[in-house]
């Protein structure tokens, strides 16, 4: 039974939205139990003297009334409430905070921009895979936070007073999506970035991660339009041109952009364009968590794992009672196959990691039923929270597991956007073969298989006499050759001369 003492909550009183995260600690990470979000647009209630309007404050208080009911079941020392840019700026913030604290029955901490950047970085470090050296970008409603670091340690924390709500009111107040408005918004953001750009570039990074609603919106757009998951400057410029053609904010229609995000999307896009150009960012991916996750992990005092994906996969193996030895056996075999063909098939370390991940949980569907276990596996992966994996990577893993045995379904392989289609198909072929060869679940029955490729033709070269000595697996390989030929993947079986 889940007791209230095991629950934690983090509330973020942002400039655009108020958010609440309710979670519990499980296996070194947090399990989300509830997320509640309300668009309050607090920053829109600031006048020229930086006073919050009564209407804006009322919207905020009404939202906190909703939050307070859920908080009644959680110990007070396991709740953190923080306020960010707008309440840092508002001259009458005390009036809002006094009433807000009465509603929640909890203290509210107005955190500095640098502390906000630190917490965002911690949320990313605990939930997002990839290289250790990272740049984290979060475009909020009233401010933009930038943080660099290695592993759990931050090296630079910056907060700039520009956000998607304030930029909307300043540069798109006439609701026109004309090129001039975009130009002014971008230019203002670039001028704000220039004093800090050089020092950020000097820190360097191996991966750039976006942790904001703007980046989430971009990810949704790219998935809807069948693009890969990496945000790049050409893609941002293409979206800007599309927005300009829509002419009016009320008429903004982009496939994959929800109505809820549309209002502040152009202003957030202008800021992101400026960040990409000033910091010379090549690609950006979506973070797995940010400020609220950073608050919860901070209360739990959990260390940052060196390999978040490994922790996630190990948790799945324990939860679903998987045969870890068999998973390793299949993984080792698949890795051996990949290394033999990596150069000819252009399979890099990213492909290697994703294939390894699929192997380590390939039997997860058996926890539901042997029948249709690949479909069960795909469902479980698709609908599980997998810290360290991006949404596109999750989709690819589910697709590989769906196609691990039986006839191949090319459709999901072509619809995933984590890898080019031909790379995803090649990983699928290697996974299927590794599962066949490891089917006896013993190390001493694995043959020394050599792989040769010519274009898409894959040749398996086996020791002399192996096929006749292992009739069941020989039959499985012959069936596999037929299944692969149906989707134009030539698979040839050969033996070395005696």
Swiss-Prot record:
Q: Does the keyword Acetylation apply?
A: no
Q: Name one GO molecular function term.
A: guanosine-5'-triphosphate,3'-diphosphate diphosphatase activity
Stated family? Belongs to the GppA/Ppx family. GppA subfamily.
Q: What does this protein do?
A: Catalyzes the conversion of pppGpp to ppGpp. Guanosine pentaphosphate (pppGpp) is a cytoplasmic signaling molecule which together with ppGpp controls the 'stringent response', an adaptive process that allows bacteria to respond to amino acid starvation, resulting in the coordinated regulation of numerous cellular activities.
Q: What UniProt keywords are attached to this protein's entry?
A: Hydrolase
Q: Which reaction does it catalyse?
A: guanosine 3'-diphosphate 5'-triphosphate + H2O = guanosine 3',5'-bis(diphosphate) + phosphate + H(+)
Which PANTHER family does the entry mention? EXOPOLYPHOSPHATASE, RETROGRADE REGULATION PROTEIN 2
* E.C. numbers: 3.6.1.40
Coiled-coil region: none
Q: Which Pfam families match?
A: Ppx-GppA, Ppx-GppA_III
Protein species of origin: Pectobacterium carotovorum subsp. carotovorum (strain PC1)
Matching entries from NCBIfam families are given as:
exo_poly_only, PRK11031.1
Put simply, this protein is called Guanosine-5'-triphosphate,3'-diphosphate pyrophosphatase
Q: What pathway or pathways are given for this protein in its record?
A: Purine metabolism; ppGpp biosynthesis; ppGpp from GTP: step 2/2
User: What is one process in the GO biological process aspect for this record?
Assistant: guanosine tetraphosphate biosynthetic process
Q: Which domain of life is it from?
A: Bacteria
